[in-house]
Amino acid sequence: SVVDGFLVIRFQIGGSDRIGYMQPVGAGDFTPVLRHLEEDILAAGQRLRIIDMTPEGLEKLRSVGHCQFAFASDRNLEDYVYNASDLRDLPGRKYQSKRNHINRFEAEYEYRYEPMTRDHAAECMRLEAEWRKTRSGHTGELSAEQRAMQRAFEHFEELEMLGGCIYVGDRLIAFTYGSAVNDHTFDTHVEKADTDYDGAFTIINKLFAQ
Protein backbone atom coordinates (compact mmCIF):
# COMPACT_ATOMS: atom_id res chain seq x y z
CA SER A 1 0.00 0.00 0.00
CA VAL A 2 0.99 3.67 -0.26
CA VAL A 3 1.33 5.49 3.07
CA ASP A 4 2.12 9.22 3.16
CA GLY A 5 3.59 8.96 -0.33
CA PHE A 6 5.75 5.91 0.44
CA LEU A 7 5.29 2.42 -0.96
CA VAL A 8 5.00 -0.03 1.95
CA ILE A 9 5.36 -3.76 1.28
CA ARG A 10 4.22 -6.19 3.98
CA PHE A 11 4.95 -9.91 3.70
CA GLN A 12 5.17 -13.17 5.61
CA ILE A 13 8.76 -14.08 6.46
CA GLY A 14 9.75 -17.43 4.96
CA GLY A 15 6.11 -18.41 4.53
CA SER A 16 5.65 -18.36 8.33
CA ASP A 17 3.19 -16.34 10.41
CA ARG A 18 5.87 -13.74 11.18
CA ILE A 19 5.21 -10.42 9.46
CA GLY A 20 7.94 -8.29 7.94
CA TYR A 21 8.09 -5.03 6.02
CA MET A 22 10.45 -3.89 3.33
CA GLN A 23 12.10 -0.51 3.83
CA PRO A 24 9.48 2.06 2.75
CA VAL A 25 10.20 3.30 -0.78
CA GLY A 26 9.82 6.92 -1.74
CA ALA A 27 11.48 10.32 -1.88
CA GLY A 28 12.70 11.89 1.33
CA ASP A 29 12.59 10.72 4.94
CA PHE A 30 10.49 7.59 5.53
CA THR A 31 10.65 7.68 9.34
CA PRO A 32 7.23 9.37 9.74
CA VAL A 33 5.75 6.23 8.15
CA LEU A 34 7.07 4.12 11.05
CA ARG A 35 4.12 4.98 13.28
CA HIS A 36 1.77 3.42 10.72
CA LEU A 37 3.90 0.27 10.65
CA GLU A 38 3.97 0.17 14.45
CA GLU A 39 0.17 0.42 14.62
CA ASP A 40 -0.24 -2.25 11.97
CA ILE A 41 2.12 -4.74 13.59
CA LEU A 42 0.71 -4.07 17.07
CA ALA A 43 -2.72 -5.08 15.78
CA ALA A 44 -1.16 -8.39 14.70
CA GLY A 45 0.41 -8.89 18.12
CA GLN A 46 3.98 -8.95 16.79
CA ARG A 47 7.10 -6.82 16.92
CA LEU A 48 8.14 -4.59 14.05
CA ARG A 49 10.63 -6.16 11.63
CA ILE A 50 12.01 -4.19 8.68
CA ILE A 51 13.95 -6.29 6.19
CA ASP A 52 16.54 -5.43 3.52
CA MET A 53 17.57 -2.02 4.81
CA THR A 54 19.92 0.24 2.89
CA PRO A 55 22.85 1.90 4.74
CA GLU A 56 21.01 5.21 4.43
CA GLY A 57 17.86 3.62 5.84
CA LEU A 58 19.76 2.26 8.82
CA GLU A 59 21.09 5.72 9.63
CA LYS A 60 17.58 7.16 9.46
CA LEU A 61 16.30 4.50 11.85
CA ARG A 62 19.14 5.19 14.27
CA SER A 63 18.17 8.87 14.27
CA VAL A 64 14.59 8.19 15.36
CA GLY A 65 14.49 8.96 19.06
CA HIS A 66 11.27 7.18 20.05
CA CYS A 67 12.15 3.88 18.38
CA GLN A 68 14.57 1.26 19.64
CA PHE A 69 15.78 -1.24 17.07
CA ALA A 70 18.21 -4.14 17.15
CA PHE A 71 20.13 -4.50 13.88
CA ALA A 72 21.25 -7.85 12.48
CA SER A 73 22.75 -9.14 9.22
CA ASP A 74 22.04 -12.60 7.78
CA ARG A 75 24.62 -13.70 5.19
CA ASN A 76 22.22 -16.39 3.96
CA LEU A 77 19.98 -13.62 2.65
CA GLU A 78 22.72 -11.61 0.95
CA ASP A 79 22.97 -11.37 -2.82
CA TYR A 80 26.00 -12.12 -4.97
CA VAL A 81 27.28 -9.28 -7.15
CA TYR A 82 29.27 -10.11 -10.29
CA ASN A 83 30.74 -8.17 -13.16
CA ALA A 84 28.76 -9.12 -16.25
CA SER A 85 32.00 -9.66 -18.16
CA ASP A 86 33.08 -12.29 -15.61
CA LEU A 87 29.84 -14.22 -16.12
CA ARG A 88 30.16 -13.98 -19.90
CA ASP A 89 33.84 -14.92 -20.18
CA LEU A 90 34.57 -16.91 -16.97
CA PRO A 91 38.22 -15.76 -16.98
CA GLY A 92 41.12 -17.12 -14.96
CA ARG A 93 41.58 -19.85 -12.38
CA LYS A 94 38.71 -18.54 -10.26
CA TYR A 95 36.19 -19.77 -12.84
CA GLN A 96 38.01 -22.92 -13.97
CA SER A 97 35.45 -25.27 -12.41
CA LYS A 98 32.60 -23.45 -14.15
CA ARG A 99 34.38 -23.72 -17.50
CA ASN A 100 34.85 -27.46 -16.86
CA HIS A 101 31.12 -27.89 -16.22
CA ILE A 102 30.29 -26.06 -19.44
CA ASN A 103 32.80 -28.07 -21.49
CA ARG A 104 31.30 -31.34 -20.25
CA PHE A 105 27.78 -30.10 -20.95
CA GLU A 106 28.62 -28.98 -24.48
CA ALA A 107 30.41 -32.26 -25.22
CA GLU A 108 27.46 -34.35 -24.05
CA TYR A 109 24.38 -32.47 -25.25
CA GLU A 110 23.08 -30.76 -28.35
CA TYR A 111 21.23 -27.77 -27.00
CA ARG A 112 19.77 -24.44 -28.01
CA TYR A 113 19.24 -21.16 -26.18
CA GLU A 114 16.06 -19.10 -26.61
CA PRO A 115 15.20 -15.65 -25.25
CA MET A 116 12.31 -16.01 -22.82
CA THR A 117 8.81 -14.72 -23.50
CA ARG A 118 5.51 -15.09 -21.68
CA ASP A 119 4.83 -18.11 -23.93
CA HIS A 120 7.47 -20.10 -22.03
CA ALA A 121 5.56 -19.75 -18.75
CA ALA A 122 3.88 -23.17 -18.65
CA GLU A 123 7.09 -25.05 -19.42
CA CYS A 124 9.04 -23.02 -16.87
CA MET A 125 6.48 -23.64 -14.15
CA ARG A 126 6.57 -27.38 -14.87
CA LEU A 127 10.36 -27.40 -14.56
CA GLU A 128 10.11 -25.37 -11.35
CA ALA A 129 7.68 -27.93 -9.93
CA GLU A 130 10.10 -30.75 -10.75
CA TRP A 131 12.99 -28.81 -9.20
CA ARG A 132 10.93 -28.16 -6.06
CA LYS A 133 10.36 -31.89 -5.56
CA THR A 134 14.10 -32.29 -4.98
CA ARG A 135 14.09 -29.76 -2.13
CA SER A 136 13.11 -30.84 1.38
CA GLY A 137 12.03 -28.30 3.97
CA HIS A 138 11.53 -24.57 3.41
CA THR A 139 8.14 -25.35 1.85
CA GLY A 140 6.75 -21.95 2.77
CA GLU A 141 9.60 -20.11 1.06
CA LEU A 142 9.35 -22.29 -2.04
CA SER A 143 5.58 -21.80 -2.29
CA ALA A 144 6.06 -18.04 -2.01
CA GLU A 145 8.66 -18.19 -4.78
CA GLN A 146 6.28 -20.15 -6.97
CA ARG A 147 3.55 -17.53 -6.51
CA ALA A 148 6.03 -14.76 -7.31
CA MET A 149 7.03 -16.57 -10.50
CA GLN A 150 3.42 -16.94 -11.58
CA ARG A 151 2.83 -13.23 -11.10
CA ALA A 152 6.04 -12.38 -12.94
CA PHE A 153 4.92 -14.38 -15.98
CA GLU A 154 1.45 -12.81 -15.86
CA HIS A 155 3.03 -9.34 -16.04
CA PHE A 156 6.21 -10.20 -17.93
CA GLU A 157 6.16 -7.27 -20.34
CA GLU A 158 4.86 -4.70 -17.84
CA LEU A 159 7.68 -5.59 -15.43
CA GLU A 160 10.19 -5.35 -18.31
CA MET A 161 11.52 -8.82 -17.55
CA LEU A 162 14.31 -10.39 -19.60
CA GLY A 163 15.03 -14.10 -19.54
CA GLY A 164 16.47 -17.09 -21.31
CA CYS A 165 15.73 -20.80 -21.76
CA ILE A 166 17.89 -23.78 -22.69
CA TYR A 167 16.48 -26.82 -24.47
CA VAL A 168 17.98 -30.23 -25.09
CA GLY A 169 15.89 -31.51 -27.95
CA ASP A 170 12.33 -30.47 -27.11
CA ARG A 171 12.94 -30.59 -23.36
CA LEU A 172 13.35 -27.39 -21.35
CA ILE A 173 16.24 -28.06 -18.97
CA ALA A 174 17.07 -24.58 -17.63
CA PHE A 175 15.67 -21.07 -17.47
CA THR A 176 16.35 -17.75 -15.81
CA TYR A 177 14.90 -14.25 -15.78
CA GLY A 178 15.37 -10.88 -14.14
CA SER A 179 15.09 -7.14 -14.63
CA ALA A 180 17.26 -4.05 -14.68
CA VAL A 181 17.76 -2.21 -11.40
CA ASN A 182 19.31 0.78 -13.17
CA ASP A 183 21.41 1.46 -16.26
CA HIS A 184 24.42 -0.47 -14.92
CA THR A 185 22.94 -3.18 -12.66
CA PHE A 186 20.79 -6.19 -13.54
CA ASP A 187 19.02 -8.36 -10.95
CA THR A 188 18.58 -12.05 -11.76
CA HIS A 189 15.42 -13.02 -9.90
CA VAL A 190 15.14 -16.73 -10.71
CA GLU A 191 17.47 -19.41 -12.06
CA LYS A 192 16.27 -23.03 -12.30
CA ALA A 193 17.67 -26.11 -13.99
CA ASP A 194 17.17 -29.84 -14.26
CA THR A 195 19.95 -31.23 -12.07
CA ASP A 196 20.03 -34.43 -14.13
CA TYR A 197 21.90 -32.35 -16.72
CA ASP A 198 25.31 -31.63 -15.22
CA GLY A 199 26.35 -28.07 -16.01
CA ALA A 200 22.84 -26.81 -16.80
CA PHE A 201 22.92 -24.15 -14.08
CA THR A 202 26.35 -22.96 -15.16
CA ILE A 203 25.59 -22.67 -18.84
CA ILE A 204 22.24 -20.87 -18.43
CA ASN A 205 24.03 -18.37 -16.20
CA LYS A 206 26.76 -17.79 -18.80
CA LEU A 207 24.54 -17.60 -21.88
CA PHE A 208 22.07 -15.26 -20.22
CA ALA A 209 24.90 -12.88 -19.32
CA GLN A 210 25.97 -12.83 -22.98
Enumerate the predicted regions with their spans:
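Accessory, usually C-terminal, subdomains that scaffold auxiliary metal cofactors
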Residues: 147-210
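Conserved donor-binding loop and adjoining core beta-sheet/short helix segment
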Residues: 1-56, 167-195
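Structured helix-beta-strand junction loops
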Residues: 44, 108-109, 159
